[in-house]
Amino acid sequence: MDALCASMKGTAQLVAICNQESAFWGEKISGRRLINKGFGVRSCKSFTTQQRGRNVTPAVLTRDINKEMLPFEESMFEEQPTADPKAVASVILGGGVGTRLFPLTSRRAKPAVPIGGCYRLIDVPMSNCINSGIRKIFILTQFNSFSLNRHLATYNFGNGVGFGDGFVEVLAGTQTPGDGRKMWFQAADAVREFIWVFENQKNKNVEHIIILSGDHLYRMNYMDFVQKHIDTNADITVSCVPMDDGRASDFGLMKIDETGAIIQFAEKPKGPALKAMQVDTSILGLSEQEASNFPYIASMGVYVFKTDVLLNLLKSAYPSCNDFGSEIIPSAVKDHNVQAYLFNDYWEDIGTVKSFFDANLALTKQPPKFDFNDPKTPFYTSARFLPPTKVDKSRIVDAIISHGCFLRECNIQHSIVGVRSRLDYGVEFKDTMMMGADYYQTECEIASLLAEGKVPIGVGPNTKIQNCIIDKNAKIGKDVVILNKEGVEEADRSAEGFYIRSGITVIMKNATIKDGTVI
């Protein structure tokens, strides 16, 4: 058998190469991230020690001495830093007024809107942070934040979630002396108001800051995102998704080069400006058909910054810019390394009543595109101590029923029933999301209200509801019909306890719908 002898460093290891031959590399590679600096090697059938320089493994050992061999220099690889969750902090934005989600945001911040029967939107980025190992979490509340603050105050970080030297801090939107009654509600300005937090001594080891929105539905490992940011030595990295033509104008759109660097960014372009942002998304790895269906690259509104870059942008470079998507990112593209990170999984922006409604009902499909049930990456929420749901002679098809409900001889199809909901006999739900209640009424209280001709919390007998969102603590009487048979798209009937948005009837929080009402 032919043999090839070579002198090698004592740290050399036998490793497998792609053609199943064996090779020795001059450094131990197990447990390290190595980055290829570019081989630039030449093919050779012979290799002499005279060619060998310092720190070079002189040969690749093969079974056949006559095969072509490639010499690998040790200097061709260097260690690539691994993302450390302890060096990462996240900022979850509480959002502004939330006009597109009105009336669901009439008394609460967007991240406090209930979703999936027992969660709130804020639980999504919170859980993603926890599951990613990020333990330094700031939540910046800005508008209508009472229910959001109350929800966060009751969070239970048990179940093996250890924060160590980490924390969850709620930074409430406040004014300080010298503000001159200035109003600030946009994302970048809101973060700017709390720059002093990141300059604090206890956060001196934070090298990267993730900016997150509190009104998206997705499951993501943020440390993969941060690792891409580190690998490309980016100043800013923007998470993006392929987007279709119908919704592209609702998002920030970007163009990237072959290295993944963002070379152009436009926030919610319309008309000709929208068409100008079309790209061949096959560069992202999409098939030809997928690239045809999704010709845009849309920002998720999820960013990671080097800490010093973020502070410099907000304080010095762009002190008057108030929004990341429309001002900071487009400006930074010109003179910073701004990279794109493709997130090719389920993601939904819960920005409108229709998108909120559709995303909730999609949870009831089999199989769902998104599922809160995943033992490896669970979703956390505030602690509740509720009994199991009681179901009496009911028919339930493709539905989610939350904790502590009472269902009596009802028919539920393709719907979500939230915590503490009470549905009386003969009730029919189809394509309906009921958020539930904040508290119970006793049987005595219910009987007393009915005796007085009043309506208790829940849904009364023989009521038929379809294509509807029922907000918390709603009181819907008996023999009510909510079908919107006339197909009304928009209506404001706050005095009667409801709105219609995009053809979806929204029963307001704490509203009373009297017996026999037809909507």
UniProtKB/Swiss-Prot annotation:
Query: Which superkingdom is the protein from?
Result: Eukaryota
The protein's name is Glucose-1-phosphate adenylyltransferase large subunit 2, chloroplastic/amyloplastic
For this chain, the family text in UniProt reads:
Belongs to the bacterial/plant glucose-1-phosphate adenylyltransferase family.
Location(s), subcellular: Plastid, Chloroplast; Plastid, Amyloplast
Q: Which organism is it from?
A: Solanum tuberosum (Potato)
List the lineage, top down. Eukaryota, Viridiplantae, Streptophyta, Embryophyta, Tracheophyta
Q: Where is the signal peptide?
A: none
The record ties this protein, via CDD domains, to: ADP_Glucose_PP, LbH_G1P_AT_C
Q: Which Gene3D superfamilies match?
A: Hexapeptide repeat proteins, Spore Coat Polysaccharide Biosynthesis Protein SpsA, Chain A
Q: Give the Gene Ontology MF terms in alphabetical order.
A: ATP binding; glucose-1-phosphate adenylyltransferase activity
Q: Name one Pfam family in it.
A: LbH_GLGC
* Pathway stated in the Swiss-Prot or TrEMBL entry: Glycan biosynthesis; starch biosynthesis
This entry carries the following GO cellular component terms, namely: amyloplast; chloroplast
An example GO biological process term is: glycogen biosynthetic process
